[in-house]
Amino acid sequence: MNDKWYRHIIGARTIKTGLATFFTSLFCMLLNLTPIFAILTAIVTIEPTAKASLKKGYKRLPATVIGALFAVVFTYVFGDQSPLSYALSATFTILICTKLNLQVGTTVAVLTSVAMIPGIHEAYVFNFFSRLLTALIGLVTAGLVNFIILPPKYYHQLEEQLALSEKKMYRLFYERCNELLLGKFSSEKTSKELSKLNIIAQKVETLMSYQRDELHYHKNEDNWKLLNRLTNRAYNNRLFISHLSNIIYLPKHTSIAFDANEKIALINISNSINGIIQKGSFARQKKSIATLKSSVKQMDEFDQNQMKSTLIYEILLIYKILDSRYAK
């Protein structure tokens, strides 16, 4: 816990941005270069992972060169007092960066382009190469800071988001089963809750992608094992949500009649799943599962019970996912 105390006050990425700004400005001043352009580059170069910083840095450098080049060209043609110099520099920088697929560097390139115009005067070549050098300093400094200092660790966030996802999806399954038992086959409420659940699941995927990228640079066998465990957990959650969506998004005018035994089975299963978070374990409902399996066997998949058969299959698959997860 001692190495995480700063998270309660300031984020690691904020700290690294401050350090990158400090070192970038220091290096520029030592070389007697204007630091503002290097600082702009350094600030936007701090990404969630070192890999992202390096990958985007390869595109930000040429984009900055393009911006500086247009600033010099249009200042030479129209002068630094003409609005055309600013407008054309920005416009052509955006245009060329887009054409060359350098969109990640467009913002810095445009800012560099318009900001350097007032200071060019007659020193066109010097200003062009000095901006190129300062941009390189900003990129390299920020990349090294992001790589060396406080390497990102997303395990804690992943654990939190996975736990939140599981709590919500178990509760949503319980609520949806209650709706089905009450004959409410179309529900705006559960549809909205499912959308929120999918947003959390997407955030989990993003965090896992960040951590996977980071482990390519800071390799650790224990961390790889931990990430694999979290990945498997997230995969099972995705399967659960996929089957859950199939019992929420039903065709219009769906109408299903459950008999007394099927209703009791659904109540027992939904209560058991809803109680997982509170109890910390999964209480198997073998008798209820046997009831649903028996019901499916008696149905013809292609008669009027087709929708009911499909619905029960989805519930059985959800149960199987949890049965495997909590297997001893």
UniProtKB/Swiss-Prot annotation:
Q: Which GO terms describe its cellular component?
A: plasma membrane
Classification via Pfam families: ArAE_1
What are the entry keywords?
Answer: Cell membrane, Membrane, Transmembrane, Transmembrane helix
Topological category with respect to the lipid bilayer: Multi-pass membrane protein
> Where does the sequence pass through the membrane?
26-46, 61-81, 109-129, 132-152
The organism's superkingdom is given as Bacteria
Q: Where in the cell is it found?
A: Cell membrane
* Main subcellular localisation: membrane
Task: Look up keyword Cytoplasm and say if it applies.
Answer: no
Q: Which family does it belong to?
A: Belongs to the UPF0421 family.
The protein, known as:
UPF0421 protein SERP1427
Q: Which organism is it from?
A: Staphylococcus epidermidis (strain ATCC 35984 / DSM 28319 / BCRC 17069 / CCUG 31568 / BM 3577 / RP62A)
